[in-house]
Design a protein with these regions (language model features):
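Hydrophobic structural segments
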Residues: 1-193
Length: 193
């Protein structure tokens, strides 16, 4: 498969134009006409992650956080980013990032699904796409009323986490997940009490 075939599919599912204006997503390095057979997924492209991907035989790396956020003035072996870009090019590895576009169009719904929320609404609206409101976060009802301790355990198990940090009375009852968002000095209550 050519890299552009995979990136085209990703662009249809998680379009770059859904990302925040400040974000840098999509094909960030490499030749999208390269043949790919092994894709390495990571949260961040650190030097250690890159070394592991190379050792693993990856010819494409997809990360959540882009390693390039703003303009680069030099690409050389004297900076972390420069070394990574040089290595990607020298090894012929294609590098693609999906950050806020994935947060808006994938991660929020996935997180709600994993924690068994239903009747969800978007927490912080960023746009309307194909007749559906899109944005960061979800607010919804839990499968049943439970203690905060039980909900923390549900999150921990559903997301396969080692630890979950919780603030508040662990014995208090919750029936839905609710967030308050601070935006331009205005507090938005999502109506979950």
């Amino acid at each position: 498969m050519k890299a552009y075939e995979l990136t085209s599919w990703l662009e249809k599912k998680y379009p770059s134009d859904a990302a925040e204006d400040w974000d840098n997503v999509g094909l960030l390095a490499g030749d999208d006409t390269n043949e790919i057979s092994h894709v390495f997924l990571a949260l961040d492209l650190t030097e250690e992650t890159l070394a592991e991907a190379i050792e693993d035989g990856a010819d494409m790396i997809i990360t959540h956080h882009p390693m390039i956020f703003s303009g680069i003035k030099k690409i050389n072996n004297h900076s972390f980013t420069g070394r990574k870009i040089l290595t990607l090019i020298q090894k012929g590895i294609v590098y693609y990032a999906m950050h806020t576009n994935y947060d808006v169009l994938g991660m929020a719904d996935l997180s709600a699904d994993y924690t068994k929320m239903h009747d969800t609404t978007v927490l912080s609206v960023t746009e309307e796409r194909e007749g559906e409101v899109q944005g960061f976060g979800r607010v919804g009802k839990l499968p049943r009323e439970m203690t905060l301790r039980e909900y923390a355990q549900l999150v921990k198990e559903s997301l396969k986490l080692n630890d979950v940090k919780v603030y508040g009375n662990l014995d208090s009852m919750v029936k839905c997940a609710d967030w308050y968002v601070q935006d331009h000095g205005q507090e938005h209550d999502q109506g979950c009490h």
